């Protein structure tokens, strides 16, 4: 169990030990200070202080909890939609885990990738790879990134990745993603829970998208909708699933070659390996495709894989008699850079995942219009 798993076992209440109780009490005290600071910050932005509006439309994609909710595939979908309408969107990413995100760096220009993954961070580089007609810029200063996008790249639309709490840049549409399997981060703000801000902040959202609704009971989804109707009245709520798009060999994915249809390798017992916010969700997605998942190895979100990790992955695959290893696209960004991983004598497969609407996609597209 890694540090992230230990933390989640504490804040979720799964750890019922005395130490777990003590930890929760301490985290609750810290949460009070965090909540006060966030509330004061939000009050400033609610008064429109320190907010900069740029000359082109801005769409923000974010969430209210820490961890993965599906922002990357949603940003990809929005850029594809805008591209089909004839626009030239640029993605503004913070560049989490980039070598230096204090600088504003152009990662890709109209589909041409300009830097290596370690310079940009895994998520920004993945977006640059899968958006052949868009540009990607990283940097903590989103206002400066917006200026570069407009003046140097000719952007006529900006898509701010993970932007719900980055309020200094005015946005014309605020899209909030909520993971239906853990919608409100154990009902507490950080660090006692996973909420980045109090749930009342959802009232700022223009559009709410529930993700992974296929991984929870329909009754829970209905209850979640009722709760959202109270917290964010009159705001449209859409239900989506994480829909696998294709499977690639690691070499084919790295080279930009074609993948093959989902289900081609379902006869192979596979081991799921991921360094994402919700490894169990990845396993459920694979099982939903018919794959025989014999073992799951979950690392921390944005994990920096090492040669030692590769050795352990191989040992676990051998111990569980896996005939292939399945990884996410985000992890493929880093693992494709490790020669030891490429040398494993077992097929390495990459699952590409997109967002699919249960219903209301056309209405969602219309609501994007500014």
Where are these regions (language model features)?
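Short, flexible loop segments at boundaries between secondary-structure elements
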Residues: 243-245, 300-304, 344-370
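Hydrophobic residues at beta-strand termini and immediately following loops
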Residues: 61, 137, 178, 240, ...
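Conserved beta-strand elements of the Class I
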Residues: 88-92, 176, 269-273
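Phosphate/Mg2+-binding loops and adjacent switch elements
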Residues: 87, 96-235, 239
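Walker A (P-loop) phosphate-binding motif
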Residues: 42-111, 215
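A transmembrane-helix-recognition feature enriched in membrane-embedded lipid enzymes
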Residues: 2-57
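Acidic beta-strand-to-loop metal/phosphate-binding motif
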Residues: 323-330
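C-terminal accessory "lid"/substrate-recognition subdomains
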Residues: 1-14, 183-321
């Amino acid at each position: 169990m890694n540090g992230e798993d230990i933390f989640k076992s504490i804040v979720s209440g799964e750890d019922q030990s005395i130490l777990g109780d003590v930890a929760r009490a301490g985290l609750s005290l810290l949460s009070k200070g965090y909540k006060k600071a966030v509330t004061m910050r939000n009050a400033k932005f609610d008064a429109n202080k320190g907010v900069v509006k740029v000359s082109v439309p801005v769409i923000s994609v974010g969430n209210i909890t820490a961890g993965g909710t599906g922002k990357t595939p949603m940003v990809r979908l929005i850029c594809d939609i805008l591209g089909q309408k004839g626009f030239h969107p640029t993605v503004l990413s913070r560049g989490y885990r980039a070598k230096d995100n204090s600088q504003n760096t152009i990662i890709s220009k109209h589909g041409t990738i300009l830097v290596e993954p370690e310079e940009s961070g895994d998520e920004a580089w993945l977006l640059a790879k899968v958006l052949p007609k868009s540009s990607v810029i990283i940097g903590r200063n989103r206002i400066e990134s917006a200026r570069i996008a407009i003046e140097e790249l000719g952007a006529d639309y900006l898509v701010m990745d993970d932007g719900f709490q980055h309020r200094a840049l005015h946005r014309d549409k605020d899209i909030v993603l909520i993971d239906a399997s853990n919608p409100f981060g154990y009902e507490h703000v950080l660090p006692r829970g996973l909420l980045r801000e109090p749930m009342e902040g959802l009232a700022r959202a223009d559009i709410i998208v529930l993700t992974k609704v296929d991984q929870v009971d329909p009754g829970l989804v209905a209850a979640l909708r009722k709760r959202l109707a109270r917290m964010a009245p009159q705001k449209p709520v859409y239900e989506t699933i994480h829909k696998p798009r294709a499977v690639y060999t690691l070499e084919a994915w790295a080279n930009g070659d074609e993948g093959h249809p989902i289900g081609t390798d379902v006869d192979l017992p596979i081991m799921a390996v991921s360094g994402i916010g919700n490894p169990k969700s990845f396993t459920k997605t694979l099982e939903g495709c018919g794959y025989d998942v014999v073992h799951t190895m979950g690392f921390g979100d944005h994990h920096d894989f090492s040669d030692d990790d590769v050795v352990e992955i191989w040992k676990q695959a051998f111990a569980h008699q896996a005939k292939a290893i399945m990884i996410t696209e985000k992890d493929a960004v880093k693992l494709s850079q490790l020669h030891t991983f490429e040398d494993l004598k077992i097929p390495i497969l990459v699952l590409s995942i997109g967002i699919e609407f249960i219903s209301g996609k056309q209405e969602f597209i219309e609501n994007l219009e500014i």
